[in-house]
From Swiss-Prot:
One of its GO terms (biological process) is ADP-L-glycero-beta-D-manno-heptose biosynthetic process. It catalyses: D-glycero-beta-D-manno-heptose 7-phosphate + ATP = D-glycero-beta-D-manno-heptose 1,7-bisphosphate + ADP + H(+); D-glycero-beta-D-manno-heptose 1-phosphate + ATP + H(+) = ADP-D-glycero-beta-D-manno-heptose + diphosphate. The gene is hldE. Gene3D superfamilies: 3.40.1190.20, HUPs. Transmembrane segments: none annotated. Disulfide bonds: none annotated. Homodimer. Catalyzes the ADP transfer from ATP to D-glycero-beta-D-manno-heptose 1-phosphate, yielding ADP-D-glycero-beta-D-manno-heptose. Its EC number is 2.7.1.167, 2.7.7.70. It is an enzyme of class 2 (transferase). The active site is at D264. This is Bifunctional protein HldE. Residues 1-318 are annotated as: Ribokinase. Residues 344-476 are annotated as: Cytidylyltransferase. It comes from Mannheimia succiniciproducens (strain KCTC 0769BP / MBEL55E).
Length: 476
């Protein structure tokens, strides 16, 4: 499947559905309240994330694809906070704001990685007139390659049949993540993406693969779908279409930490790929890979183009390969939660030689994960002179990504990685050569966090300068 790509240059996706804001309060619980037999949580930090249809839009934006989001919110602080959060990710928000309803908000209180309580602030929109929302859809849909209707049963999709007909009239495929057991209301959609529980609640118990295929094809015929994608957790996913063989994909998940939002990821990647002109098979393959990535993260999460590209090309077995700083921080947080020891080193790695390979292998043996921070081309030029680097950053990163000792690669543009090391805070900082530990960039930050710093020896006679000199001598 290496010919598949996570670059969606032609895609534009429109999302309409139940938007909500997920709020998280994290704190310590060290005592019971004297007022009632409940724990007292001393809140230490909080976080806000887009939920529902807004998380679908976030998933699409993380793939560097233009996305517009339509939905209903209140005229309140929460609605403004949600809009601001989405706009920072370059999502075009066009909401109908209602003075009669609050923005749907879910507040979760957590301590020691356990959810203690969830507070829901909502009043469903089932009695709200959809005229303004339908007008917005009619004006916008013709400019997009796919429409996602994200149904969380909150009432935004009251007039879902009219929405489907508007999209069909514009010849835009409609993908729906369904809710409830009344699938008749989705008649005429291009594709539904129920999970196995939702599917069986509608068609009945499926004991065999044949049952899934037979009942799925009957459902397609009954409600006039073009296709049906049943997501089956650890059993992968199955695509069904009239007159064609079932297309089954085994799960891509290596480790499962949280399935929150996995369905949003599936439909987001699926719609993006179809909007980019990909086949159903390729779109399903890509969404399956993306789901395998996102369930390895905590909470409602998204998948980036880099993560998806790495996984497609088989680089996920050594971590997530090449990452940006934000992705690296998430990966490190998850690894530390699993009790893994993080080792970090850095360098230019202009011309990779046996000394580099041996050094990185030795560094990797000191922990469970190895991060390699690599100087950008401008950074190398400032340090080594105008004739360097010999190999540009993408080339250097690609070669390093091929080493089994390297888990994660990240670029930095400063002269030293001190800032980056101070933000990542590895358990062990490693540097090769004749440095004193206290002179290594980032050592003070690592020590202050309780980590350690170690100097490793390079192999004698192995250096990039020596390699360059030999090449020059041969040229002369």
């Amino acid at each position: 499947m290496a010919q598949y790509s996570a670059q969606f240059n032609q895609a534009k996706v429109l999302v309409l559905g139940d938007v909500m804001l997920d709020r998280y309060w994290f704190g310590a619980t060290n005592r019971i309240s004297p007022e009632a037999p409940v724990p007292v949580v001393r809140v230490q930090e909080n976080e806000e994330r887009a939920g529902g249809a807004a998380n679908v839009a976030m998933n699409i934006a993380s793939l560097n694809v233009p996305v517009q989001l339509l939905g209903l919110t209140g005229l309140d602080e929460t609605g403004k906070a949600l809009t601001t959060l989405l706009q920072t990710q370059k999502i075009d928000c066009d909401f109908v704001r209602l003075a009669t309803h609050p923005t749907i908000t879910k507040l979760r209180i957590l301590s020691r990685h356990q959810q203690l309580l969830r507070l829901d602030f909502e009043e469903d929109f089932k009695n709200v007139q959809s005229t303004e929302l339908l007008t917005k859809l009619e004006n916008a849909v013709k400019n997009f390659g796919a429409l996602i209707l994200s149904d969380y049963g909150k009432g935004t999709l009251n007039d879902v049949q009219q929405m489907i007909q508007i999209a069909r009239k514009a010849k835009v495929p409609v993908l729906i993540d369904p809710k409830g057991t009344d699938f008749e209301r989705y008649r005429g959609a291009t594709l539904l993406t129920p999970n196995m529980s939702e599917f069986e609640a509608v068609v009945g118990k499926c004991d065999t693969e044949e049952d899934i295929i037979e009942k799925g094809l009957k459902l397609i015929a009954d409600i006039e779908l073009s296709a049906l994608l049943v997501t089956r957790s650890e059993k992968g996913m199955t695509l069904l279409r009239p007159g064609q063989e079932a297309y089954h994909l085994p799960t891509e998940a290596k480790e499962v930490f949280d399935v929150t939002g996995a369905g949003d990821t599936v439909i987001s990647v699926l719609a993006t790929a179809l909007a980019d002109g990909r086949s159903f098979e390729e779109a399903c393959f890509l969404s399956n890979v993306a789901a395998g990535i996102v369930v390895g993260k905590l909470g409602t999460s998204t998948v980036s183009t880099i993560e998806l590209e790495n996984a497609i090309h088989g680089r996920s077995s050594t971590g997530f390969g090449i990452m940006n700083e934000d992705e690296l921080k998430v990966a490190v947080q998850l690894a530390k939660a699993r009790g893994e020891k993080i080792v970090m080193t850095n360098g230019c790695f202009d011309i990779l030689h046996p000394g580099h390979v041996s050094y990185l292998e030795n560094a990797r043996k000191l922990g469970d994960r190895l991060i390699v921070a690599v100087n950008t081309d401008d950074s190398v030029k400032r340090l080594k002179g105008e004739t360097r680097p010999i190999n540009d950053l993408p080339s250097r990163m690609a070669v390093l990504a091929g080493l089994s000792s390297v888990d994660w690669l990240v670029a930095f543009d400063e002269d030293t990685p001190q800032r980056l090391i101070g933000e990542v805070l590895p358990d062990l900082l490693v540097k090769g050569g004749d440095y004193k530990p206290e002179d290594i960039a980032g050592s003070k930050e690592v020590w202050a966090n309780g980590g350690d710093v170690k100097v490793l020896n390079f192999e004698n006679g192995c250096s990039t300068s020596n390699v360059i000199q030999k090449i020059r001598e041969l040229k002369d």
